[in-house]
């Protein structure tokens, strides 16, 4: 798939999103900062990427997801948990960055912060019914299928 990308900050020309390995699902996104950014515990900030994308095809969307090491090692996760980029969005990709940890964290310019995953989208239409056909699960939820 070819993805239209607009470089909003000239430094990003040399730091385009990239797959770390041939098996990677996500493209690494970097913090397009001019100086280190200190996040205090509990603080959330929007971090620019210096890039914009346009998927154009309503059959696709992009997800901004955390990098596992940032969350596990440093407590740095996404403030919105998952960023959803619709196919018709054309603005700068911003990363809602939340320090859920207990210590201060410093994010450096051009540090890999999140990942972008392109996913297929199915737009549903509704079929209004009075009752559903019976299923094995029914209305059971929130642990109703057991612990293990």
From Swiss-Prot:
Pathway info: Pyrimidine metabolism; dUMP biosynthesis; dUMP from dCTP (dUTP route): step 2/2
EC numbers on record: 3.6.1.23
Binding sites annotated in the UniProt record for substrate: 67-69, 80, 84-86, 94
SUPFAM superfamilies: dUTPase-like (SSF51283)
Cofactors (names): Mg(2+)
UniProt GO molecular function: dUTP diphosphatase activity; magnesium ion binding
Assigned keywords, A-Z: Hydrolase, Magnesium, Metal-binding, Nucleotide metabolism
One Pfam entry name: dUTPase
GO BP terms, alphabetized: dUMP biosynthetic process; dUTP catabolic process
Catalytic activity: dUTP + H2O = dUMP + diphosphate + H(+)
Annotated NCBIfam families: dut, PRK00601.1
Role summary: This enzyme is involved in nucleotide metabolism: it produces dUMP, the immediate precursor of thymidine nucleotides and it decreases the intracellular concentration of dUTP so that uracil cannot be incorporated into DNA.
Family indicated by similarity: Belongs to the dUTPase family.
Official protein name in the record: Deoxyuridine 5'-triphosphate nucleotidohydrolase
Taxonomic path: Bacteria, Pseudomonadati, Pseudomonadota, Betaproteobacteria, Burkholderiales
């Amino acid at each position: 798939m070819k993805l239209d990308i607009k470089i909003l900050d000239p430094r990003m020309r040399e730091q385009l999103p990239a797959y770390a390995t041939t098996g990677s699902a996500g493209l690494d996104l970097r913090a397009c900062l001019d100086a280190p950014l200190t996040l205090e515990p509990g603080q959330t900030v929007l971090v620019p990427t210096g890039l914009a994308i346009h998927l154009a095809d309503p059959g696709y969307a992009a997800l901004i997801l955390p990098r596992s090491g940032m969350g596990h090692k440093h407590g740095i996760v996404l403030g919105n948990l998952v960023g959803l980029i619709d196919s018709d969005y054309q603005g700068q990709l911003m990363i809602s960055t939340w320090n859920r940890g207990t210590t201060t964290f410093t994010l450096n310019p051009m540090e890999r912060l999140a990942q972008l995953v392109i996913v297929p989208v199915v737009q549903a239409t509704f079929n209004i019914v009075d009752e559903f056909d019976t299923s094995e699960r029914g209305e059971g939820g929130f642990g109703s299928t057991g612990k293990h």
